[in-house]
A protein has these predicted regions:
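P-loop NTP-binding core
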Residues: 1-273
Length: 273
């Protein structure tokens, strides 16, 4: 089983970050729907919203205005993860919500680092998540569309990374920069970090371009590319505005089936079916 263990040898949940500094590639949609689909298969899942925009938070049914404490409070040391986690209305799925305050956390962490040379600004999230990870089978992190300190904290805390890639022209643009960031994290901060997989998103079967992009990405990443391809669908785009994952919003849709298939692949790759 490809899972981390604590000092007692007990299996702890796998932490997977969804990362791509390009916006609009289906990162948050995948974070929400992969989390919900894993939960549907009986996995205990914590969805961690690290994007200050908070779309993963609203996408599982919470109003940003009602959030009293968020992952920001975990970062600044005023709360533990267990104080902030919210139970969603979906079985086996919990949320660590985001807030707009998170937008300034990079600067706050840098300032703390200047004031205290022993302050480890890249390890704040890892140390906090390690305290709760044995309560979950998976912790899925929705990263912001940037490679700043928030994302660095996510990569340092994670066992692996899923890169969502849109099936469109310039799909691989910025991928080299992202892979360099992952390699740098491996070298300096988290030698155990691995590439979990590459997910093709927003595929339009009506265009030849989409098929060309799939071939290009498969030749580049080989077996790391998931068999599952996420289609471009109106129902998938609508679901977050209703505060529901696609498997709750439209269970019989192609989008719902695609994310259930992806969850199955993730479970199989990690040997915890």
């Amino acid at each position: 089983m490809n899972m981390s263990k604590n000092e007692k040898g007990e299996i702890m949940g796998k932490i997977i970050s969804l990362v791509n500094q390009k916006g609009g590639v289906g990162k948050t949609t995948t974070s929400i729907n992969l989390s919900a689909s894993l939960a549907m298969y009986g996995q205990r899942v914590l969805l961690l919203d690290l994007d200050p925009q908070g779309n993963a938070t609203t996408g599982v049914g919470f109003n940003k205005g009602d959030i009293e404490r968020s992952v920001y409070d975990v970062f600044n040391g005023t709360a533990e993860v267990s104080d902030v986690v919210l139970r969603t209305k979906f079985k086996n799925l919990s949320l660590l919500p985001s807030s707009l305050q998170l937008a300034g956390i990079d600067i706050e962490l840098l300032e703390k680092g200047r004031e205290n040379p022993t302050f480890q600004k890249a390890f704040q999230l890892r140390d906090k998540l390690n305290m709760v990870r044995e309560n979950y089978d998976y912790i899925i992190i929705d990263c912001p569309p940037s490679l700043g300190l928030i994302t660095t904290n996510a990569l340092t805390a994670s066992d692996s990374v899923i890169i969502p890639v849109q099936c469109e022209f310039f799909a691989l643009e910025g991928i080299t920069q992202l892979l360099n960031a992952i390699m740098l994290t491996q070298k300096k901060l988290n030698p155990e970090l691995k590439l979990e997989g590459v997910l093709l998103t927003m595929f339009d079967s009506k265009t030849n371009l989409g098929i060309e992009v799939i071939e290009e990405i498969r030749s580049y990443f080989k077996e790391k590319v998931y068999t599952t391809i996420i289609p471009r669908l109106i129902r998938l785009a609508e679901a977050p505005s209703h505060g529901k994952p696609i498997i709750a919003y439209d269970p019989k849709s192609k989008g719902s089936q695609a994310y259930l298939n992806l969850a199955k692949e993730v479970i199989e790759r990690n040997g915890n079916a």
